[in-house]
A protein has these predicted regions:
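A domain-level signal for the mature, folded cores of soluble proteins
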Residues: 4-25, 32
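Extended surface/linker regions that mediate inter-domain or inter-protein docking
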Residues: 22-172
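Mature N-terminal segment immediately following signal peptide/propeptide cleavage
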Residues: 1
Length: 172
């Protein structure tokens, strides 16, 4: 299910968890009802990759570009759960590159959860153009032509009956 991140919907432990994969460190914390991730700024790193910079050059600078972002949304509730943080433009959402395996109660790096060619460059999944159409109802990706800010809308988070069957009518 796609849901707002709350103590009731976040299934993974966030209490001072430290995760490491492929040279990157992720620090997860919880303070009351707020969940946060400290990581290399995915907006900065995505821009560096998009500009064609060598991964070794990016790696040398990465630690200087750490940010702490709140977890604002979750996807998944049956087998694995993913977590989303705000990006730098409008309502852009980026997924942290870890999934929580619910049955095994453990974290797993996203790049190890899917088949990819060896030495594939790091990439960043965005909700707004990648997951929105299947994991929401009435999802409409959008962007301001003047500010280039992401302006995504959804009638409802999650996959409701109307997502597949069209506009709802009174149930009989």
């Amino acid at each position: 299910m796609t849901q707002k991140a709350t103590p009731q919907t976040v299934l993974a432990p966030f209490d001072d968890v430290r995760l490491e994969s492929r040279g990157r460190r992720y620090e997860l914390t919880r303070s009351g009802d707020r969940f946060e991730v400290n990581l290399v700024d995915p907006d900065w790193e995505s821009a560096q990759i998009g500009d064609g910079r060598e991964s070794s050059a990016i790696d040398r600078e990465a630690e200087r570009h750490r940010v702490t972002r709140p977890v604002v949304m979750t996807t998944g509730s049956h087998h694995v759960q993913g977590y989303w943080i705000p990006g730098d433009r409008g309502n852009l959402l980026r997924q942290i590159p870890w999934y929580f395996h619910i049955a095994e109660q453990r974290w797993m790096p996203r790049e190890d959860a899917f088949l990819e060619p060896p030495r594939s460059p790091r990439h960043f999944i965005t909700w707004n153009d990648n997951c929105l159409t299947c994991h929401s109802t009435g999802g409409r990706p959008g962007m301001s032509k003047t500010t280039l800010e992401v302006q995504t809308e959804a009638a409802e988070l999650g996959i409701s009956c109307e997502a597949c069957h069209g506009a709802g009518r009174k149930h009989v």
